[in-house]
């Protein structure tokens, strides 16, 4: 059996990158940091964030869990200092997905894991797809809830019920539903949570 560990970096130590791992109401692991630390095949070697206070907290936490915990203030700085990356996880605010994902792709890891939504619009998503194709780097969009026990239960019900004719759903995520002006930063529920 191979004992290779995949050298992994995390871009963004905010809500989905780190903080949701402490939410006791969520099925865990609920953040990229916690999932990466839990996986024995992952070597979480570095992270970056523009919030330097949170970055220090992240560093202390991951070091206490056996990670090297190198930290950088930007993706550019990280990629200049970390070589031969296997996996780059992009978990930044939606408004930075295009820039950070392209930067990750151009660093040529073996895989980029991009937090959903892919981008703020289809034009930005296409730029990411084009860059990935050009650099021959696969980009996987994170939809972890499909593995959630509640989603698995819903799938079992759907198999029993048969072909779905209609679905009605309500979502209360605390985010705004949608307005044109929210497209600039992606902070609306339809884009952020609607993909689930």
Task: Kindly give the residue locations of the regions a language model identified.
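N-terminal Rossmann-like dinucleotide-binding module
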Residues: 1-64
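Short active-site oxyanion
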Residues: 42-46, 86-88, 188
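Rossmann-like dinucleotide-binding domain that binds NAD(P)(H)
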Residues: 177-196
């Amino acid at each position: 059996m191979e004992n290779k560990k995949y050298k992994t970096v995390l871009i963004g130590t905010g809500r989905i990158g780190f903080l949701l791992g402490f939410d006791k109401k969520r099925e865990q692991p609920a953040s990229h940091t916690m999932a990466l630390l839990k996986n024995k095949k992952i070597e979480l070697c570095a992270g970056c964030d523009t919030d330097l206070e949170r970055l220090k907290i992240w560093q202390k936490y991951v070091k206490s869990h056996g990670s090297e915990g190198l930290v950088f203030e930007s993706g550019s700085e990280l990629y200049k200092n970390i070589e031969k990356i296997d996996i780059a996880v992009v978990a930044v605010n939606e408004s930075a997905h295009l820039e950070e994902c392209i930067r990750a792709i151009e660093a040529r890891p073996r895989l980029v894991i991009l937090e959903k939504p892919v981008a703020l619009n289809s034009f930005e998503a296409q730029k990411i797809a084009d860059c990935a194709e050009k650099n021959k780097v696969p980009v996987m969009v994170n939809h972890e809830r499909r593995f959630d026990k509640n989603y698995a239960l819903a799938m079992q019900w759907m198999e029993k019920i048969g072909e779905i004719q209609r679905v009605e759903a309500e979502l209360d995520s605390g985010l705004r539903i949608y307005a044109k002006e929210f497209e600039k930063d992606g902070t609306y529920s339809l884009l952020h949570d609607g993909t689930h």
